[in-house]
A protein has these predicted regions:
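N-terminal amphipathic/basic-hydrophobic helices that include classical n-h-c signal peptides
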Residues: 1-4
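Concave beta-strand-loop units of leucine-rich repeat
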Residues: 6-37, 43-58, 67-79, 89-102, ...
Length: 231
């Protein structure tokens, strides 16, 4: 596309230098003086946080924010999502290396807002009813999480476009629910012997099923990023 696309939380890869700096909250709780000295997110739309810790509820260390759209937690010690209700309009939640995360308890409070959920390297985490209540989810990544019995739960997400489960094992091996889903157009996983489809086959079938790309691209020199055009 020739038109200039405004960078926001919907893009697969966010170019932070194209966002207003005063909308971004960055904090490393191991080096609290590195970026901001307070924990006030009330005016932030984006938050990228490292090493968030709490004895009972890690989120107690952060202020409420109705403006927050994107929250990324790296190496947080959270075990569940209790306390995340203070970000009532959150659209995108990313968790990386949150190795203690074991439960989706508390996540359902975001069911009216959350559209992207990415959980990466939480080997104890397995989705249950709270995650399944997120009816607005469009991108779901459960990479290197706990074993999942089957993919029947995908039918709970009527607007899901992109589903990834790299290094997460689907125990029954049946990947047909990906193809049966009416809106999933992209899937990512590693091939396993007991799966009934290889990645290459799923990718080919989805390409044929959705002939139109339906992506909006942003360019920066030789690089590009995209978001799904679903609005």
């Amino acid at each position: 596309l020739n038109r200039k696309e405004k960078m926001d939380w919907r893009f697969n890869g966010i170019w932070w230098d194209q966002l207003q700096d005063d909308t971004i909250f960055r904090k490393d709780f191991k080096e609290p003086s590195k970026w901001v000295t307070n924990n006030d997110l009330s005016d932030s739309e984006y938050a990228v946080i490292w090493h968030l810790k709490g004895k009972v509820n890690s989120f107690e260390n952060l202020s409420d924010s109705e403006k927050l759209l994107y929250l990324e937690l790296n190496w947080a010690n959270i075990k569940d999502f209790i306390g995340i209700e203070k970000f009532s309009n959150l659209k995108r939640l990313e968790l990386h290396y949150c190795t203690k995360l074991a439960s989706d308890t508390g996540l359902s409070v975001l069911k009216d807002s959350l559209e992207f959920l990415h959980i990466n390297r939480s080997k104890k985490f397995v989705p249950t009813d709270e995650l399944l209540s997120l009816k607005k989810i469009k991108v779901l990544c459960l990479n290197e999480c706990g074993n999942i019995d089957n993919l029947d739960f995908l039918s709970n997400f009527p607007e899901l476009i992109d589903f990834r489960f790299v290094n997460t094992n689907i125990l029954d091996g049946n990947l047909q629910p990906i193809l049966d889903h009416p809106t999933i157009r992209s899937a990512g996983f590693l091939n396993k012997r007991h799966y009934n489809y290889k990645y290459e086959k799923i990718d080919s079938i989805l390409d044929d099923k959705f002939a139109i790309d339906n992506k909006i691209y942003a360019y920066k020199g030789e690089y590009r990023t995209f978001r799904y055009d679903y609005e």
